[in-house]
Every structure is written in structure tokens, then in C-alpha cells.
Amino acid sequence: MQMCSLLGTLSLAFAVHSPVAAGNEVPAAATDTYIRELSQLINDYRARHGLQPLTFAENLAALANDHSVDMAARRKLSHDGFRNRAQSTRSKVCVENVGWNYPTAATQLDGWRHSPTHDRNLLEPKVSRMGLAVTTRYVAFFACT
């Protein structure tokens, strides 16, 4: 199996802005809206830096979803299994950002933007596809070539 360039960050950025209070979660009905908004915000941010937009890929969304479900079940923000997720795509480059407890897509993106490693992942020029998922308060962004 082709080895992926592992650019997934191992640093975890928690709250740059005030997170929602414990117990408050992204409502299930709002999850699709949150994902659409976050996707648009990521692509707008990339465009401001002269980068191409990322297309939404169902297979990457499924990997992001599995990871967000796992983090929620374990109540632990992590990059556990990143190497396996990346290798399963057979892509040359994959990046991953995770987040927890951001009340809106805008505050989630802002948290990532203010973390150098997460920001680098958002602005990785080699990736072209992305998947996003939200399970309770756990967000996963997964992008590959």
C-alpha cells in the first residue's frame, strides 16, 4: 500500500474562543447546516489564500464520520487512527483537523486558523477533496489529494 504523507496534526487546539458549556451539543437537526457552513468557510478561507476549493467527497465524509463518532463515544479529542484512515484512501497526501465544543462553524474555523498546525492543514495546497462530520460536539475535517 502506498504510504501517505502524514500531515495530520498531533497537536490539539482546544478553545481559542469561548466554547459552549459542557452538555450543550450541536443539535442533530443543525448538523447538516453546520457541515455546509464549515465547508463553505473552509473554501472561502482557501480562496483568500489563492487556493482551489475542496470538493466534498462522500468516502472522506464517511471516514470523518467514523472518527467523530469514535471520539464522541470515548469522549476524547484525538487523531487516533489517522494513519489507517489516510492509507485507506490510497492518496499521497491527507490532512486532518479535529475540534471539540465550538458552538458554530465560524468559531470552529477560527480556532483552527489560530493554531499554526491546523491552519497549515486548512491551507495544504496538495489536497483537493474533503469530508466533514459532527457527532455531538466532536468535529472531524479530513482532506486528501
Predicted regions and their residues:
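Bacterial N-terminal signal peptides
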Residues: 5-15
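Surface-exposed patches in mature extracellular/periplasmic domains of secreted proteins
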Residues: 48-62, 75-85, 119-134
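A short alpha-helix/helix-coil micro-patch that ends at or immediately precedes a cysteine
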Residues: 23-72
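Disulfide-stabilized extracellular recognition modules
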Residues: 102-145
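Short, surface-exposed glycine/acidic/tryptophan-bearing loops
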Residues: 61-108
